[in-house]
């Protein structure tokens, strides 16, 4: 008879969790930041608010965003005008849209990741799904499992309303699942659609206006597993360690409240300072065991909460400008997609490394860090180890 210890050892993988494939997807509808103020004030019937529109246009200009992809169209707003009002009861119709579209967009990213991975979907043992939108039972994880035709025995984890730090949360969760279940292959999906947060402008809610200028829709999927079979799987990044912390006395710094009017967004002006003053402590705790204290020796995947946050972190840590290039590129091309952002940046990082003929998937560097920042104020820190590039 096997002992409990023997059973536990047999259940565990030998090596670290590894990202084996990445897929991303966006809605078709694209909005350009240069004329978004005109579009936004027109579709919300707010063109009479001329001074506020000028202020919003300045916010858009400073956002460092070129374009975003958004599921919500002008035709949908014409059909459901309460969504475009500032504070009108609209949760029911928002839910009707989101509970269908969030899993559908997640499916698009998941299929791309599965195709890159190249293995039968029957080998997916676990599913981790994350979204800030559309709470229901059974959840988006159940819907996605059915849309993809996964095994009925797939072990599911559903994460709702985590917010912008959750790209780190899903990787931390997938790491624990992969390393504690030998042979596990974890499909991780983040799918975000801003139908739940879209609303018209108000003079009394400038933080809401900031959100309207920043957020975009997108989904990203990764497949995570330990002990990859390199004859049929292509490792991209190892997940070496993962930690979460929250900054004391900052519960309201980034917040969302689900109400009859949808999900309202609240933001303190000092969020960039709060994050930049606490990020080095997270780095030190994560990299001390590795003897690393030069933050410019790392490749960087940082959630792009907005340009002010990136600028503050860059200045506080004396980072070279090129360190946040991949992060700024994703912000520019897609906006802030909440939990999906860091997975988009991982994808950009490995593609950029391949195109630039770098030695590793981390722009030629061995070690990297992935940061998620969000409500709480919560910081997720994931230590990454890159993989030598395959040239064929």
UniProtKB/Swiss-Prot annotation:
The keyword Transferase applies. GO terms for molecular function: acyltransferase activity, transferring groups other than amino-acyl groups; trihydroxystilbene synthase activity. Induction: By stress. It comes from Vitis vinifera (Grape). The lineage of its organism: Eukaryota, Viridiplantae, Streptophyta, Embryophyta, Tracheophyta. This is Stilbene synthase 3. Mediates resistance to pathogens which are sensitive to stilbenes. Keywords: Acyltransferase, Cytoplasm, Plant defense, Stress response, Transferase. It is found in: Cytoplasm.
């Amino acid at each position: 008879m096997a002992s409990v210890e023997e059973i536990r050892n047999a259940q565990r993988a030998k090596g670290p969790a590894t990202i084996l494939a990445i897929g991303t997807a966006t809605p078709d509808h694209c909005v350009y930041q240069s004329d978004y103020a005109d579009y936004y004030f027109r579709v919300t019937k707010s063109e009479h608010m001329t001074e506020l529109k000028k202020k919003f246009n300045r916010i858009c200009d400073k956002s460092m965003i070129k374009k975003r992809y958004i599921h919500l169209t002008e035709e949908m707003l014409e059909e459901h005008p309460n969504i475009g009002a500032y504070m009108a009861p609209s949760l029911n119709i928002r839910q009707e849209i989101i509970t269908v579209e969030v899993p559908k967009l997640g499916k698009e990213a998941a299929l791309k990741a599965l195709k890159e991975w190249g293995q039968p979907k029957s080998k997916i043992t676990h599913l981790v799904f994350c979204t800030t939108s559309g709470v229901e039972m059974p959840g988006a994880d159940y819907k996605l499992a059915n849309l993809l035709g996964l095994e009925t025995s797939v072990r599911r984890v559903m994460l709702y309303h985590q917010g912008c730090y959750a790209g780190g949360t899903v990787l931390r969760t997938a790491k624990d699942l992969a390393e504690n279940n030998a042979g596990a292959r974890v499909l991780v999906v983040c799918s975000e659609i801003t139908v739940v947060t879209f609303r018209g402008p108000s003079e009394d809610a400038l933080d809401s206006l900031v959100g309207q200028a920043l957020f975009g829709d997108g989904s990203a999927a990764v497949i995570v597993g330990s002990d990859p079979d390199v004859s049929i799987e292509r490792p991209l990044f190892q997940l070496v360690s993962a930690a979460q912390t929250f900054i004391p006395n900052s519960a309201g710094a980034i917040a969302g409240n689900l109400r009859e009017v949808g999900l309202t967004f609240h933001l303190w002006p000092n969020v960039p300072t709060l994050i930049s003053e606490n990020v080095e402590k997270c780095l030190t705790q994560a990299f001390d065991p590795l003897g690393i204290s030069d933050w410019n020796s790392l490749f960087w995947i940082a959630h792009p909460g907005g340009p002010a946050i990136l600028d503050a972190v860059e200045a506080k840590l004396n980072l070279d400008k090129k360190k946040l290039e991949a992060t700024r590129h994703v912000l520019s091309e897609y906006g802030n997609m909440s939990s999906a952002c860091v997975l988009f940046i991982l994808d950009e990082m490995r593609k950029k490394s391949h195109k630039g003929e770098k030695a590793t998937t981390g722009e030629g560097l061995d070690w990297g860090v992935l940061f998620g920042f969000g409500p709480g104020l919560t910081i997720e820190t994931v230590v990454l180890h890159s993989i030598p590039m395959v040239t064929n």
